[in-house]
């Protein structure tokens, strides 16, 4: 955010004249979350909802959370079969009450998992989940069937269209889209802008 602006929260154009503030998980990139120092409009690389993560069944996945926000956060892979603790005893589930501590501002935590079951699940922040999920800290986590020479699109960061579908999807469908619906709480989303 820009400390020079009255309202230093990134806003998203969701309809003409409607620009609520959101939080979002995003792939690491260069630059600010805003278009410029003079604008609160979101950088084009920062999209809502948080990006879909697509992986193959049986692949070892490492997701790193670098918390650049002013609140603590975590990532919980909801419905994904994975160990609650790493081999070294550190928490690995993103649930602060049971498995690991909060990821405080400026800190980094990596989650390791090897999904065994295919399907469409979600990942979300599990710190004050009733608020952080509504604020945008939720995304789709899709585990594709593992097939030889399968190439899956790891991140889908905009418009929902999956540019590189898996072999299983291509056999049955001509196109694939990731659709995730998000509720908005007008008061909550405007509260962070004041």
Predicted features and spans:
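Internal, charge-rich low-complexity segments
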Residues: 5, 148-153, 189-194
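N-terminal, post-signal-peptide metal-ligating segments of extracellular/periplasmic oxidoreductases
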Residues: 1-102, 194
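A general structural signal for short secondary-structure junctions and capping/turn motifs
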Residues: 53, 66, 114, 130-133, ...
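Short alpha-helical segments and helix-capping/turn motifs at coil-helix boundaries
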Residues: 46-49, 60, 108, 126, ...
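Acidic-aromatic/histidine active-site loop/patch
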Residues: 11-12, 23, 27-31, 37-38, ...
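Residues in well-ordered beta-strands of folded domains
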Residues: 76, 142, 178-182
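Extracellular/periplasmic metallocenter environments
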Residues: 66-73, 80-84, 91-159
């Amino acid at each position: 955010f820009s400390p020079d602006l009255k309202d230093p929260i990134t806003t998203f154009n969701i309809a003409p004249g409607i620009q609520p503030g959101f939080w979002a998980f995003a792939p690491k990139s260069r630059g600010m979350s805003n278009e410029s120092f003079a604008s609160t409009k979101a950088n084009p690389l920062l999209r809502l909802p948080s990006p879909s993560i697509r992986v193959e069944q049986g692949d070892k996945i490492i997701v790193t959370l670098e918390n650049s926000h002013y609140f603590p956060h975590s990532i919980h892979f909801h419905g994904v079969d994975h160990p609650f603790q790493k081999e070294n005893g550190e928490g690995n589930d993103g649930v602060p009450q049971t498995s690991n501590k909060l990821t405080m501002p400026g800190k980094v935590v990596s989650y390791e998992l090897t999904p065994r079951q295919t399907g469409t699940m979600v990942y979300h922040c599990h710190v004050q989940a009733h608020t952080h999920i509504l604020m945008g800290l939720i995304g789709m986590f899709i585990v594709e069937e593992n097939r030889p020479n399968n190439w899956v699109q790891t991140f889908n960061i905009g418009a929902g269209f999956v540019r590189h579908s898996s072999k299983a999807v291509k056999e049955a469908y001509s196109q694939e889209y990731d659709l995730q619906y998000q509720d908005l709480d007008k008061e909550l989303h405007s509260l962070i802008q004041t």
